[in-house]
Amino acid sequence: MMKEEQWAPVIVMLISSVAMGSVNALVKKALDVGVNHMIFGAYRMAISALILVPFSYIWERKTRPQLTFMLLCEHFISGLLGASLMQFFFLLGLSYTSATVSMALVSMLPAITFALALIFRIENAQNLKSKAGVLKVMGTLICIMGAMLLTFYKGPELSNPHSHPQARHNNNNNNGHDQTKKWLLGCLYLVIGTVLLSLWMLFQGKLSFKYPGNKYSSTCLMSVFASFQCAILSLYKSRDVKDWIIEDKFVILVTLYAGIVGQAMSTVVTSWSIKMTGAVFVSTFSPVSLVAATLFDFLILHSPLYLGSILGSVVTITGLYVFLWGRKNETDQSVSKTLNSSQFSQNKDNEDHTIANHKDTNLPV
């Protein structure tokens, strides 16, 4: 029977992954209404900051470091990489494609992070010669193949018996050169957003090491910076103040849901799960978000689904699990080396102790 420490992270991550899948599907629907995607992002980050303020005050007020210029600069960069710029490209890509494609490309995150770690020499290139290294490279390449399939092969639309005839008619009218161009651009924007998120994870790893035990305060400060950054980036599309007044009730509800569940709660749950089980365990739940987004988008929101999205998603998820298999082998090898080293040291100490006792017994009286 599983103990609470074992099943609790599984249950929490399942709920969180399903919620994130639904967030992406709902956000796609909200963007289709015509809201400025960076105004949406600014509201989302502002709501996240407001939600995280009490958590950071109650649990981290005694351990929180002083606000220095360097700390502010670091969190400004963190907000730029992991929130504002990432959302700029990701939400733009989502508006041009679908929730299924967006979640499939996000599943490439571990592989892209590994590739960037190699480029910046955070990951040792010598490790690529091992079995774990070969598996990680294979997984990364398969993920890239899946991304290319998602991008360049849309495929036929799978019929949805629940979709409204008028919606299907409008979708058929939108087919053509412009629609294909938007699809390709959308996939490109999603890949750029995922790369930015990977860069943020590498940067955040160093930031978390520098400021341990302050995940709520750090995320709250990042969200504050990101909300202002998103507001500035929104000017590229519209400078009309009226665009900030959202009257559509559905968009308002989605904005609140995305800020509370998709940003604040997701950050807290993910941070707790990483602390309890590790980042690799958390990465294995990416397909759950993908399946949830697909089902929510197709069955509830009645959006069209394409064959290329399904095939590309399957290839991408296959690459993800090959990569995670390599990570598991690497971890097992590291643990084995540590145990062998510890056993060797213990045997050496016992041997030295035996020799010392033997010498003592041979001393003349």
Curated annotation (Swiss-Prot):
Any single GO CC term annotated in Swiss-Prot or TrEMBL for this entry: plasma membrane
Transmembrane domains' residue ranges: 7-27, 39-59, 76-96, 100-120, 132-152, 183-203, 216-236, 250-270, 280-300, 305-325
Membrane disposition: Multi-pass membrane protein
Keyword field: Membrane, Repeat, Transmembrane, Transmembrane helix
MF terms (GO), sorted A to Z: L-glutamine transmembrane transporter activity
Region (Disordered): 339-365
Domain of life assignment: Eukaryota
Record bears the keyword Repeat: yes
Record Pfam families: EamA
Domain EamA: 20-151, 216-324
Any one GO BP annotation for this protein: seed development
Location in or out of the cell: Membrane
Regions of compositional bias (Basic and acidic residues) in chain numbering: 348-365
Family statement drawn from the similarity comment of this UniProt entry: Belongs to the drug/metabolite transporter (DMT) superfamily. Plant drug/metabolite exporter (P-DME) (TC 2.A.7.4) family.
PANTHER family (UniProt xref): WAT1-RELATED PROTEIN (PTHR31218)
Protein name: WAT1-related protein At4g01430
Source organism: Arabidopsis thaliana
